[in-house]
Amino acid sequence: MKFKIEAQAENTAARAGIISTAHGEIPTPIFMPVGTVGSVKAVHQCELRDDVKAAIILGNTYHLYLRPGMEIIEKAGGLHKFIGWERPILTDSGGFQVFSLSSNRKLKEEGAWFRSHIDGSKHLFTPEKVVDIQRSIGSDIMMALDECPPGTSDYDYARKSLSLTHRWLERGWKHFNETSPKYGFSQAFFPIVQGCVYPDLRRESAKFVADLGAEGNAIGGLAVGEPAEKMYEMIEVVNDILPEGKPRYLMGVGTPANILEAVDRGVDMMDCVMPTRNGRNGMLFTSRGIMNMRNKKWADDFSPLDEEGTAWVDHEYSKAYVRHLFVANEILAMQIASIHNLAFYLWLVTEARQHIISGDFKQWKEEMVVRVTNRL
């Protein structure tokens, strides 16, 4: 994997670049649709490719390990072939999912014990096993196993958690360098900065991660209950330390405004389930603001779903029709909304990239943050 910075914005840390992988190039800043179990919910791969214009998607180690399992994925020749996706894939280590299980998991020095949410069976994720699973998946970018503590964690817990994450990271990094890809193309390994909302812990973790010299670095443990301003502060603290010449991936973030603020602070990659999850519940994000498609105000609005939208669905269907589909609980409503929201998110980061290159990102961003938070 290679990363080239093409432009640096003035009066801001925002930058535009290109990540080169075995499965293609990724223009940055980039938003990555989440395909947890090998599927972006309600969206075909051809729609992701041609309509949404996704350059990279996510898969999740925890979910893919449990179902369909590594034997099936290996027989298929890796996740790319299994799901019919020729562009890059990033896989999360599953650490966040294990953390989310709460009462059904135990963290030990050896790794994370957990019970499957599917059948209750007991499993152990070690830093080494998570690398092996992601070798079997064949993702272009794999993540280190970490603990993702709640944003409300006290300092003592946050420090203990960070120490465990760093010890796991050393083991995972060592194992990554001692193993080889299974499908004939290179894979990158991203370590994850943790430390909750404590600046000294974030600095310590960022330095630890930077010193590894991995091909890219991730920022985890944010957007987990802390105020947005605290999240932005932690991004600044971390990005002051992480090397400029490596891509920076902010995990699990967020709203359109969150994404713009993260890019402003030097983040290159982001992912979140929000555009698809909220879309399935009738919330549409647009360049003019947020629409709740269940609201009666759209019942007789026959204008296009989004006059400024880039997706086919934006101009093919009216607001009234999509509102009708949601009220009638039709599956098509979820599909249309998911495609629209993902296309909007990809449009947003593409526009951000263009404004970084043209030199007016800061002014554009300030105007856009106001617009995208407006309730229509």
Where are these regions (language model features)?
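Structural signal for hydrophobic packing residues in well-ordered secondary-structure cores
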Residues: 138, 169, 173-176, 180, ...
